[in-house]
């Protein structure tokens, strides 16, 4: 492993180690209880949210990406999961407020436990929350890289737990995977 790979692995391991245990169970409990799950983010956090949405679909959940032309209206009993490093992304705040006003539950996945979005959330998942310095600027990992990659890692581990708990098989998940590609 070269020094850059070691840097990435070291930083991400630190963030994951400082993310309190049990948030994966809380997320999965809210997903299970929801009628439908809506997922959103902005920028690279949007890309991470798409990974998670796809895996939930593979696991058999009814999931919509916010902002797509075919996304239905959110309603009471639904769940909105939003990924925002700052917890205050201006383009996402109106969506969080709208979802809340419609009676949906809100999960905010962020590097900040306290934020405007957190104030509206039913669950805040503070990735790296036990380390105040987890997201300090790191040369070679610019502009949110640490948050985005550690969030992807955390959510993939959450899916691994879901697959194990529900006894899902790769064959069963693959049968749900898109076949018009």
From Swiss-Prot:
Cited function: Catalyzes the isomerization between 3-hexulose 6-phosphate and fructose 6-phosphate.
Q: Under what name is this protein listed?
A: 3-hexulose-6-phosphate isomerase
- InterPro entries the UniProt entry points to: PHI/rmpB, SIS_dom, SIS_dom_sf
Organism equals Methylomonas aminofaciens
Q: What protein family does this chain belong to?
A: Belongs to the SIS family. PHI subfamily.
NCBIfam families according to UniProt? RuMP_HxlB
Catalysed reactions listed for this entry = D-arabino-hex-3-ulose 6-phosphate = beta-D-fructose 6-phosphate
Q: What is the lineage of its organism?
A: Bacteria, Pseudomonadati, Pseudomonadota, Gammaproteobacteria, Methylococcales
The record's annotation in Pfam families points to: SIS (PF01380)
Q: Does the keyword 4Fe-4S apply?
A: no
